[in-house]
Every structure is written in C-alpha cells, then in structure tokens.
C-alpha cells in the first residue's frame, strides 16, 4: 500500500507544469520551445534580440523533466552533449541554482531566465504542461 501511494505521488510530480520565468525588469514578453532549446544548449544568448542568461534548476527531477520536454534530451544525451562542448572549448553548461539562490539572482540580474514548478519565483513567460 505504501509503495502504491508513493508511486502515485511520484507520477503526479512527473506531470507537474514547469514555468519559464524571468526577472520582472526584463523586457522579454514571449518565448518558444525552440528559443528555449537553443538557449539552454547555448546555441544563442538572445531571444527576440534581448540578451538572456539561462539558469538550470538544482532540483534533479525538475531539471530532467524540463530537458525532456523542451530540449528533447535525456540526462545521458545531455551529458554527452556538454562533454563534447567543453572538450572542444565551445561553451559551458548553464549555471545551476537552488530556488532560494535563484530568487536572489533574479533580483540582482534582469537577464536571467529560468524554470521551476513554482510559478511565483518570477514573471512567467510560458508554462510547459
């Protein structure tokens, strides 16, 4: 019975909405899945001509779900991608922050874009189901 309850809780968590948000001071008004994928793979550093800095979640479940839904990569594929990027000297993966660290960083830097299951963290641009 305990395992059934645990599996129900975990499966419902896997289907949580993920909010894409930015600082309240950022001028960005919309973002697409493609924009996010390119940004989080560091193929670009702007969206609609506005500079943004992607931040990853330290929460492993939220991180995995975001990359699965938006970037269409598993953790293993993502690891291989970043190893290649680092080895060839191209770029580093986005910085990872906890929710608490992220809230502080959003107040300090208006270029931050991030994701979380808590839509109250910043100004929401997009919700991923």
Q: Where is each model-derived feature located?
A:
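Flexible loop/hinge segments at secondary-structure junctions
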Residues: 17-129
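Sec-dependent N-terminal signal peptides
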Residues: 3-13
